Curated annotation (Swiss-Prot):
HAMAP family, per database record: DNA_ligase_A
Species annotation: Methylibium petroleiphilum (strain ATCC BAA-1232 / LMG 22953 / PM1)
CDD domains documented for this protein: BRCT_DNA_ligase_like, LIGANc
UniProtKB keywords: DNA damage, DNA repair, DNA replication, Ligase, Magnesium, Manganese, Metal-binding, NAD, Zinc
Similarity field: Belongs to the NAD-dependent DNA ligase family. LigA subfamily.
Descriptive protein name: DNA ligase
Catalytic residues as annotated in Swiss-Prot or TrEMBL: K124 (n6-amp-lysine intermediate)
Gene3D superfamilies membership: 5' to 3' exonuclease, C-terminal subdomain (1.10.150.20), 6.20.10.30, BRCT domain (3.40.50.10190), DNA ligase/mRNA capping enzyme (3.30.470.30), Helix hairpin bin (1.10.287.610), Nucleic acid-binding proteins (2.40.50.140)
Cofactor entry: Mg(2+); Mn(2+)
Function field: DNA ligase that catalyzes the formation of phosphodiester linkages between 5'-phosphoryl and 3'-hydroxyl groups in double-stranded DNA using NAD as a coenzyme and as the energy source for the reaction. It is essential for DNA replication and repair of damaged DNA.
Xref: InterPro entries: BRCT_dom, BRCT_dom_sf, DisA/LigA_HHH, DNA_ligase, DNA_ligase_AS, DNA_ligase_CS, DNAligase_adenylation, DNAligase_N
Reactions catalysed according to its record: NAD(+) + (deoxyribonucleotide)n-3'-hydroxyl + 5'-phospho-(deoxyribonucleotide)m = (deoxyribonucleotide)n+m + AMP + beta-nicotinamide D-nucleotide
Binding site for Zn(2+): C416, C419, C434, C440
Highest taxon, organism lineage: Bacteria
Length: 677
């Protein structure tokens, strides 16, 4: 009898080792040593062994990269270290690199004759940012960036990506979070779309959208069939691992652990060298096997990075230097009017589809009637389309060719195309707005979606399709009516089974406990963004004081000017708006209130720094943060010697351990409430 038959455990271990090695050679190093057929043979042999001996099947086996069960949904993941974005240099010429170098030297107060700084230069991948969490070298979680603080758990799909190692080499650190980009190579994208066309399915518009959609698939077996790639470029939470002193050294160290790192990275000295890197990559951009939308520069030395620090949550030591947006010409087939959440009527160009900036564009914004007139655009013209900011397509002008027939200028409608209400233009404004308010179905839909958003009332499961059914079916006409929805009414809608309906009802109930800032933001008041809502909540402390404040009192709030103050006053002067607010409160929507800064009373937590970890019994994290900040305290994302209190709930993680190690006071929700009293 052979050794293989005598010791299946040893053979299975050998096969796993071989498969991991060859997968790394193929997917990471792009230097395979065996043909595909041989890799498939080894894979099949391991599958057979594990089927015959189920006890040999391990979570990190190459055969377990597909998780067949369809998940109910993606759960939220709170990032231990926020996934912050970096600043974008708006000067897309090589001189943008010189501006960054000058800004860094100025921030470091370097004299003109000081030696040039060393920078790490790399590509800016056009994909989806991902955080990989390894514990003792084993992949335990993958999460999207989300809003920077909270992302989505996508371990089930990211685990199918062959270039993402499930086990790192030679590392036993308790925690190592690796950050990078998931993307789809152009040849993989073309092959995927070809398969979609052959199957009569919808094709993807660009590799980035394909990658994002695949990562967020609930069924991991679908992700397995749609190949993605990954490049590492940074770190998140790190415990028990010595981080190299330079960024270039970090990337080399990550590569040594078995993580894929792009080969185009380099280290240069001075701004001129950065500009040369920008120009060089631009020249070969179209020949790259994947899409990029720029390059990234980072000060190489970590000590200098720490010295430079952050500005408005963006590192001073890094910048994304983009390339000019791509432009194409196409025919303007027509103009339609889109009605926004606040009633704004926006002319939208209906275009002959054109591929521009990596996307097939058939609609583009025309902004307003004045822009239409200024650019001299009329239906039937050949126009120039650009993806503004590589995201929002816009018509930037017309190709100056003679028209063969008279075409009149486009005129904005005098009535809303959705509800027929009068369209009005405020004095001093270029925009026409529907006067129908929530009578207008288009505004109702957008108002409901805004109200339910993650940073507003956070009603999970209330998306576009469902809102469309609720409004078009006459089920919902006002915001408070959301809280009267029951399972019986929901199950009658398309794609709403008993479980989905019950989940939405539960989400509606959970959303009733909120914060004043979130509630103000959710109302969709013109000019009131998230930051202004927080400032109002902090200043006044109670909704009634906000609603009753005069323009003069509103102007006392940080960053509130005459336009914002008048917008607030106008909103709350409308009886129907106050009625909506009262109906929402009657439905059970509530939040904690306080005396507010306006009273100039001493605040009990002034000067104190808190860190939140785990799940609190009755307070959501945002609600707790709001209360602490309203009482004068500060909420930080990580524990340090400067932390005064760590508020720990159920399933508190590494922050609790670090607090205990540093001797920082650890309290629960009850103790926090006692401090607030």
């Amino acid at each position: 009898m052979s050794d293989r038959a005598e010791d299946p455990a040893a053979r299975a271990a050998q096969l796993r080792e071989q498969l991991e090695y060859h997968a790394h050679r193929y997917y990471v190093l792009d230097a395979p040593e065996i043909p595909d057929a041989e890799y498939d043979r080894l894979f099949t042999e391991l599958q057979a062994l594990e089927a015959a001996h189920p006890g040999l099947r391990t979570p990190d086996s190459p055969t377990q990269r597909v998780i067949g069960a369809v998940l109910e949904g993606l759960s939220a993941v709170r990032h231990a270290v926020p996934m912050l974005s970096i600043k974008t240099e708006t000067d897309t010429t090589p001189t943008g690199a010189l501006k960054f170098d000058a800004a860094v030297r100025n921030a470091l107060k370097l004299p003109p004759d000081a030696p040039p700084l060393r920078y790490a230069a790399e590509l800016k991948f056009d994909g989806l940012a991902i955080n990989l969490r390894y514990q003792a070298g084993r992949l335990v979680q993958a999460a999207t960036r989300g809003d920077g603080e909270t992302g989505e758990d996508v371990t089930h799909t990211v685990g199918t990506i062959e270039s993402v190692p499930k086990q790192l080499r030679g590392i036993t650190a308790p925690v190592l979070e690796v950050r990078g980009e998931v993307f789809m190579r152009r040849d993989d994208f073309e092959a995927l779309n070809e398969r979609q066309r052959e199957a009569g399915l919808k094709t993807f518009v660009n590799p980035r959208n394909a990658a994002a959609g695949i990562v967020r698939q609930l069924d991991a077996s679908i992700a397995r069939q749609r190949p993605l790639s990954f490049f590492a470029y940074g770190l998140g939470d790190v415990q028990g691992w010595d981080v190299p002193p330079t960024h270039a050294g970090l990337l080399d160290a990550l590569a040594a652990l078995g993580l894929p790192v792009d080969a185009h990275r380099t280290v240069v000295e001075g701004g001129e060298a950065l500009a040369a890197f920008h120009a060089g990559i631009a020249a070969e951009r179209d020949a790259l096997p994947f899409d990029i939308d720029g390059v990234v520069y980072k000060v190489d030395e970590r000590a200098l990075q720490q010295q430079l620090g952050f500005k408005s949550r963006e590192p001073r030591w890094a910048v994304a230097h983009k390339y000019p947006a791509q432009e194409q010409s196409t025919q303007l087939a027509g103009i339609e009017i889109q009605v926004g959440r606040t009633g704004k009527l926006t002319p939208v160009a209906k275009l002959q589809p054109v591929f521009v900036g990596g996307t097939t564009v058939s609609n583009a914004t025309l902004h307003n009637r004045f822009e239409l007139r200024r650019k001299g655009i009329r239906i039937g013209d050949t126009v120039i389309v650009r993806r503004a900011g590589d995201v929002i397509p816009e018509v930037v002008g017309r190709v100056p060719v003679p028209r063969t027939a008279y075409i009149p200028n486009f005129r904005m409608p005098r009535a809303c195309p959705v509800c027929g209400s009068q369209a009005l233009r405020e004095r001093g404004s270029v925009d026409y707005r529907c006067s129908g308010g929530l009578f207008c179905a288009a505004q109702r839909k957008q108002a409901l979606l805004h109200f339910a958003g993650r940073r507003m009332m956070d009603i999970e499961g209330l998306g576009d399709k469902l809102v469309e059914q609720l409004v078009d079916g006459g089920i919902i006409r006002t915001l408070p009516e959301l809280y009267r929805l029951g399972v019986a009414k929901l199950v009658a809608l398309e794609r709403m089974g008993d479980k989905s309906a019950a989940n939405l009802v539960a989400a509606l109930e959970a959303s009733k406990a909120t914060t004043l800032a979130r509630f103000l933001f959710s109302l969709g008041i013109r000019h009131i963004g998230e930051a202004t809502a927080k400032d109002l909540a902090r200043h006044f402390g109670a909704l009634d004081r906000v609603m009753d404040a005069s323009v003069e009192q509103l102007l006392e709030v940080n960053d509130v000017g005459p336009v914002v103050a008048q917008s607030l006053r106008t909103f709350f002067d409308q009886p129907h708006n106050r009625e909506v607010v009262e109906q929402l409160r009657a439905a059970g929507v509530h939040w904690d209130e306080h005396s507010g800064e306006a009273d100039l009373t001493p605040r009990p937590l002034a000067g104190k720094t808190f860190v939140l970890t785990g799940t609190l019994p009755s307070l959501g994290r945002e609600a707790a943060k709001e209360l602490i900040e309203a009482a004068g305290g500060k909420v930080a994302g990580s524990v340090s010697k400067k932390t005064d209190y760590v508020v720990a709930g159920e399933e508190a993680g590494s922050k609790l351990e670090k607090a205990q190690a540093l001797g920082v006071a650890v309290i629960d929700e009850a103790a926090l409430r006692a401090l607030l009293d």
